[in-house]
């Protein structure tokens, strides 16, 4: 995620005096850093109507997005309102919104569907995975579910123990042979173009921001198409970005990223190569904050098959 600031002039510098005073008052309760995603927050809906947000300063557009996300205002907007809103924003507003985050939880569990083109071959069936992630230190448990490719596989990564290796088994009859493997070794690359460390919502946001910096540094325009989609029952705002240069300078020639309406992260990623072929498709399904103990990342856990 897959999945990117944008380089362009601001749509407006300052709004008129009286309007600016009212906007600043409306956002006074939202001037602090965003709270963690799993922290209860009673943020008031922003006072400025969605149709007028494009007239605000860049800073206040970002604050409006944050307040609208946390208060539930974004998800209440119609499809047409969402498209018009994001079309009206300063090109730097969305990157700033993501940069301020938070782009994930301190620890959380999610299920995901993932397909990647490996050595030119698109898989017949996507991976369906259950993933548990904790930070500081980064620890990951992943299991490939029965209804997807590579069913039965399990891996554990703990950067506090072996930062360059994972412990896992291939599933099926091979699950009696767990072994340590390199994060970037042949076995890991046979199933994914990514490291296990890339699992999670945070990586996709950082990829998006990194790609955006490339556009700015190269002085290239970043064309954007905006639409609203429902993916696996989740309504998202889908942004399609296409670069005139393509790979290898950029991660993808074209990408479509689906923005979650309640959190500053992406729920879906589609990436296309220079020939227009889809080479990566990821959907984060259920994302749930959870607190884990050490047994979650211990291969001796009785619920695991190591």
Protein language model features and the residues they cover:
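N-terminal cleavable signal peptides for secretion/export
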Residues: 29-128, 304-306
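A short, polar/proline- and glycine-enriched secondary-structure boundary/capping micro-motif
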Residues: 121, 150-158, 176-181, 249-251, ...
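Sec/Tat signal peptide C-region and signal peptidase I cleavage site
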Residues: 24-28
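Bacterial N-terminal signal peptides
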Residues: 12-22
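Bacterial N-terminal signal peptides that target proteins for export
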Residues: 2-13
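Gly/Pro-enriched, hydrophobic low-complexity segments
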Residues: 31-38, 45, 50, 145-147, ...
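N-terminal mature ectodomain segment of secretory-pathway/periplasmic proteins
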Residues: 89-175
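An internal, short helix-loop-strand segment that often contains or flanks glycine-aspartate motifs
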Residues: 173-191
